[in-house]
Amino acid sequence: MQRKPSQKSATDKLFNHRINEKITGVSRVRLVSDDGVAIVSFEEALRKAKEENLDLVEVSADQELHVCKIIDYGKYKFELLKKNKEAKKKQHVINVKEIKIRPRIESHDYEIKKKHAQEFLGKGDKVKVSLRFRGREMMHSDLGMKVVYRMIEDLKEYGLAERDPIQDGKQIVVIINPK
């Protein structure tokens, strides 16, 4: 029975740097330190890092000369985690909220559905307005279209329809994007 390869977590992917003696197969490096940028031997770069009680961290291995920095790796990891956490906070996931209505909806029910749609659009979510026909209501699809167009018109100041309402079988659907 074979083992599954282990899944790397997000933090493992963030910290895939080689440090100190783990940097192998390199004779010369481009060293970035407080003194500036210099091309030195790997041993000299490691010695400088040890003298300053810091770590030699490989930042980039893409070029012919590997780029290394002399930094406190623990502090560097903490800063990267902090930046990553801040970036996640700033992300906003757009959800699609659905409002279901009927062709012969009462005015009070319509107002409540409209109010919910306004709240969703105010939060930055998309709203999918779907009007469903039952039985013989299909014969009066124009009545359903009027209700959907009325909803689009009432929500104009909160969002705009992606495209005109589409009748798909027994329902009419339109998606409204927030402004």
From Swiss-Prot:
Pfam hit, one: IF3_C
GO biological process: ribosome disassembly
Keyword Cytoplasm among UniProt keywords: yes
One GO cellular component, as annotated: membrane
Gene Ontology MF terms: ribosome binding; translation initiation factor activity
Cleaved signal peptide residues: none
Alphabetized InterPro entries for the sequence: T_IF-3_C_sf, T_IF-3_N_sf, Translation_initiation_fac3_CS, Translation_initiation_fac_3, Translation_initiation_fac_3_C, Translation_initiation_fac_3_N
Subcellular location(s) per record: Cytoplasm
Keywords of this entry: Cytoplasm, Initiation factor, Protein biosynthesis
Keyword Membrane on entry: no
Gene3D superfamilies per the UniProt record, alphabetical: Translation initiation factor 3 (IF-3), C-terminal domain (3.30.110.10), Translation initiation factor 3 (IF-3), N-terminal domain (3.10.20.80)
Assembly and oligomerization: Monomer.
Function summary: IF-3 binds to the 30S ribosomal subunit and shifts the equilibrium between 70S ribosomes and their 50S and 30S subunits in favor of the free subunits, thus enhancing the availability of 30S subunits on which protein synthesis initiation begins.
NCBIfam families: infC (TIGR00168)
Family according to the record: Belongs to the IF-3 family.
Protein name per Swiss-Prot or TrEMBL: Translation initiation factor IF-3
Gene: infC
